[in-house]
Amino acid sequence: MTNSTKVEKPWTKWHERLHKSLKSKSNLLPYGSSLLISVSGGQDSMALLKLILDLQRIYEWKVHVWHGDHGWHNQSRQIAEELEEWCKCQKLSFFCNRTNKQKVSTEEDARNWRYKSLIQQAKTLSKESPSLPCERVLTGHTANDRTETFIMNLARGAHLKGLSSLREDRTLETKIQLIRPILRFSRQETIQICDEMDLPIWIDPSNSNIAYSRNKIRAEIIPVLESLHPQSTIRISNLAERLTSLQKDQHQLAHLALGALLTSTGLSRSKMTKLSKTVRAIILAQWLEDNKAPLLSSKQLEELSQKIGKNKGPGNMDISNHLKIRWNKNSIELIN
């Protein structure tokens, strides 16, 4: 744990910035709502927690803290215990779930475990207080996280939806929203917040392990981009945000188009062949999403769009172990 000794300021430009953002989106964190904040103890989540606690007097939120101990290093239990003690001193309710590397060994496993645990904790809080259900889960993702996610998904060949995946809010489950209030803050700014407000920071050694792809991007790729083009991290994050807006517009237009293309069994192939290859790919992506099918890469969507085009024969394409797309002269169907 690191700590500074400066005098805390009651209201800063950081408070004002978040306050203005929340006022412009009143449904993001509604007045008087119950909030469950995921706190690792690192600079981003501690900065978020402090700002939320200071704004609490204006919004009258009920704040709860959740911590996930992955057990990936020897200090993880100590970090959890010290964070719990700090939260108790702040008179905050604190909840902790623990796992280990045998159960959660990859970045994706860890992310899925965290969200599953957060959803369960939110449900428990709602059950304990039906009059004040916990419908908002907060994380300390920043502009840097969005840039790293963008680069990872770009390298993997993600479609537009994948490139705009880290959003300010999204639905985790019915009546439970994931909110990222400081997504427009940079990591440089969160460390400044922690320094100015005398906040403790717990350093997670696993964050420096470049065996994990996100850490490798953070340690090796981002510094090169910044040396070539200073502030590129923020510009890439802003691009991802614009793509999010574009994807939402595309989502609405695709739904309108699907209304004319849907049949009792799937999609009308004769109508689909009249569209351009690019538009077919957009429609297919939306159709698959609506049917809760796995997200295909841009390359897979282009390949599928090409195969169902004009003057192409019948065929099929596996999209998971238990799901395939089959098409004939008249229709395009999902087959289990």
Swiss-Prot record:
Keywords: ATP-binding, Cytoplasm, Ligase, Nucleotide-binding, tRNA processing. GO terms for biological process: tRNA modification. Its main location: cytoplasm. ATP binds at S40, G41, G42, Q43, D44, S45. It comes from the Bacteria. GO terms for molecular function: ATP binding; tRNA(Ile)-lysidine synthase activity. It catalyses: cytidine(34) in tRNA(Ile2) + L-lysine + ATP = lysidine(34) in tRNA(Ile2) + AMP + diphosphate + H(+). Pfam families: ATP_bind_3 (PF01171), TilS (PF09179). Ligates lysine onto the cytidine present at position 34 of the AUA codon-specific tRNA(Ile) that contains the anticodon CAU, in an ATP-dependent manner. Cytidine is converted to lysidine, thus changing the amino acid specificity of the tRNA from methionine to isoleucine. The N-terminal region contains the highly conserved SGGXDS motif, predicted to be a P-loop motif involved in ATP binding. This is tRNA(Ile)-lysidine synthase. It comes from Prochlorococcus marinus (strain SARG / CCMP1375 / SS120). The gene is tilS.
